[in-house]
Amino acid sequence: MGSNSTAIPTTSVAELKYLSLLARDYPTQAAAASAVISLEATAKLPKGTEHYISDLHGEDEAFIHLLNSASGVIREKVDLVLGENVPKAIRAELATLIYYPARKLPLLKARYPERFELEAWYRQTLLRLIDVCRFVSSKHTREYVRSCLPQGCGHIIDELLHAHFEDHNKTLYYGQIVGSIIANDRADAFIIRLCELIKRLAVDKLHIIGDLFDRGPRPDLILDRLMTHHNVDFQWGNHDVV
């Protein structure tokens, strides 16, 4: 009679070496499988936007505008999200608010001297910013988006980004969150943080291609800004040679 025994798979010395390294981060089969599932799912997400800027030549104001507007990407996202439901002038205004929230916000608020008018504008603006932020976050995993959330109010923004407004009970819940933000005089802070988050999520990586110095007045301000960017690479140009 033939043997019914099942052959036991063997592992080579080389395989054991790599398995032992893998086990440091993934000590169980379940942990390794979970990581594979997550990575395979992430690979199916759209590629993040990469922003290329060259020939800065010390022109700090022009550079800051390119950075804040992502060379038109932010306005494009605003138009895609709000579409024909919002007039073109209002969409342009919202895009400018995203570019320069601290500078633009006081100017927009000054149009509404009455408290009830200002509160209505706050609510509308917060909801529109949440819609834009939700759209630009769709290229990223929820874990990555959470890592970008500002401290202090990140959990509230996370709730609003994953709102399901088709659920009546949740609609009341999210409406109460926005109302509480306004009632507790936190609307300005949330607007500014949402604007910064939109800019952060809209561009995955920034590439600076040469010629930072020469001609312009403040290349140092450009360097200062680049030092705070979340993901940038840099190539020196011939004008940067001392």
Tell me what each language-model feature is.
Residues 1-242:
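Feature recognizes metal-dependent phosphohydrolase scaffolds
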